[in-house]
């Protein structure tokens, strides 16, 4: 599989376009500011009254309503939350989109599951940084980048001197992606593997494992503080080693005792039943059931902040003992407070 770097992308392509970034959340903030600082003409499209309007203006960005930002755009990057994208596209983007404009996404959810069906005259591409927006922004400002994926769903640029893939690479370069490396995939592959990774391993699997470990120690009489350190705080130390050089690299770095414990106890936690459950999760994603369940839950929201399933679980997480003991311990760790990835005042 080819990996594309800075020398493989022509940043002048995206610098010659008017780019509309729809949304100013974690990813929208990163993309808009990174492209702006790369010399791209960027307009942030937001709904009137959005709390993000002032934040974007304070960052030195041009801000307009979604409809107004789209009218003159050559490329529209839709970075609003997945559950809002279809309505925004149908009501504000589609009626104002230039015939030849390029639609871009950072996740294939709405295209792959056919919630958004673009016109045939619009090229459809994906530039998907493989990291949270806060990381995309912080690595860019530090001179680095986050590995990214690109995908082409529709290339309608037959009259141009460049292809939709050239545009995707150019955008990725302006966003810092080619500093780290860019891989090409498909909307289907990105969507299904991304959702599976989030649910079974990175978010759902990991947080459930952390909480179960914490609860096991506390229920056995150990202090919440020690349980927090052993089951949550140290995860970064281990995942950094894995990310750097793989699982064997982590094994090389840890003690023989820890390595032996990995081999004999890990399979008792992650069993054949766990893998069977993972396959069920993947099947729900592939069939579109997860997408429909998620969107149905969102439709029951009165304020746009999540439906009953989302809200009940979000509140349960907030009151879990690991959150309160963690907040107290982190407040005493000065090294954690020096450079935060998430600053809710600006992103």
Curated annotation (Swiss-Prot):
Cited Pfam families: KARI_C (PF01450), KARI_N (PF07991)
Residues of the active site: 107
Pathway named in the protein's UniProt entry: Amino-acid biosynthesis; L-isoleucine biosynthesis; L-isoleucine from 2-oxobutanoate: step 2/4; Amino-acid biosynthesis; L-valine biosynthesis; L-valine from pyruvate: step 2/4
SUPFAM superfamilies: 6-phosphogluconate dehydrogenase C-terminal domain-like, NAD(P)-binding Rossmann-fold domains
Gene Ontology terms: biological process: isoleucine biosynthetic process; L-valine biosynthetic process
Cofactor(s), names only, from the UniProt record: Mg(2+)
Keyword Metal-binding found: yes
InterPro entries linked: 6-PGluconate_DH-like_C_sf (IPR008927), KARI (IPR013023), KARI_C (IPR000506), KARI_N (IPR013116), KARI_prok (IPR014359), NAD(P)-bd_dom_sf (IPR036291)
Family: Belongs to the ketol-acid reductoisomerase family.
Name of the protein: Ketol-acid reductoisomerase (NADP(+))
Species of origin: Gamma-proteobacterium EBAC31A08
